[in-house]
Amino acid sequence: MSSNKVTAAIIDYLKQAITTGSISEEEKESLEVAAQCIQDSFKIKPEEIKPKSGDRLVAAFEEYEKLHPVEEDSTAHVNKEEAEKLKLEGNNAIAAKDYQKALDLYTKAIEIDPTSPVYYSNRAAAYNQLGQFENAVEDALTCLSLDPHHARAFGRLGRAKLSLGDAAAAADAYKKGLDFDPNNEVLKRGLEAANKQLNQPSDSSATSGADQARTSAGAAPDLGSIFGGGMPDLGSLMNNPAVMNMARNLMQSGALNNIMNDPNIANMARNFQSGGGMPDLSSLANNPQLQNLARNFMNNNNNGNTDNNNQGNPPPQ
């Protein structure tokens, strides 16, 4: 078959599609333009376009496929099996809490098969466990670009966003995940945690988040932040919930006696009692005993708030 006959058959096939196909008017116009462009480009005369030549072209192609079947790429099949093996090893590493090893294994699986949404979702879970939340967001979004209905990816995205302080985005992610998996308890708990954070006053949330970050890094909490950065009077101190809560804990734990044995603290107290004015709060904030006490106080408060660490992390697939 000459090239002109093939071209003419293609034009006939397009014209048949226009008249017999269930296509919209806009699509018909596009096919008409395409057929005319091909005819003009190859200088095909109208009499060269034989009726039903398009059908014969399709039949010839189908016959060729029967005689020359496309063989499955065995190498690709083997590679996918290797990627699945790496994924399973990564899942085992997650179960053993070896998150860095899991991350490395998922990365190798992605290098072999970058089209699997599950690998990105699982690596997002590993990133979350390692505290690399920006990377977790990126992997979760990549997974969702490959599979928009992947509920677990929404959970991992929600946890990363919540850990980054974006409670609104976290709540949105958890809600979308629940649209596809309404009975998922992890997503439900994650949404509850995100809504709880959204309902907290913004200033106290920011202060709490900063204090937790400093405490988790091993640094002393900022005692000065309790006083709002200024030098308060005694009345405002007594009305400050954070100060009163700390005072109650001091008295209940018996730690107040240890503090008063510190010569610097005792001297400040005597000076205040004798009319020497308010003590230097900057010095108080830098006192090692007070810093250590505040750190322990904050850690005790945080012990009851560990649910967020488990949000969005069901077992990997």
From Swiss-Prot:
GO cellular component, one term: cytosol
Subcellular location as annotated: Cytoplasm; Nucleus
GO MF term (any one): membrane insertase activity
Compositionally biased spans, kind Polar residues: 198-215
Example of a GO biological process term: post-translational protein targeting to endoplasmic reticulum membrane
Disulfide bonds: none
Segments annotated as TPR repeats: 14-48, 83-116, 118-150, 151-184
Gene3D superfamilies: Immunoglobulin FC, subunit C (1.20.5.420), Tetratricopeptide repeat domain (1.25.40.10)
Main subcellular localisation: cytoplasm
Region: Disordered, residue numbers: 198-224, 298-317
Alphabetic keyword roster: Chaperone, Cytoplasm, Nucleus, Repeat, TPR repeat
Function: Co-chaperone that binds to the molecular chaperone Hsp70 and regulates Hsp70 ATPase activity.
Sequence similarity: Belongs to the SGT family.
Record protein name field: Small glutamine-rich tetratricopeptide repeat-containing protein 2
Native organism taxonomy: Eukaryota, Fungi, Dikarya, Ascomycota, Taphrinomycotina
Gene that this sequence comes from: sgt2
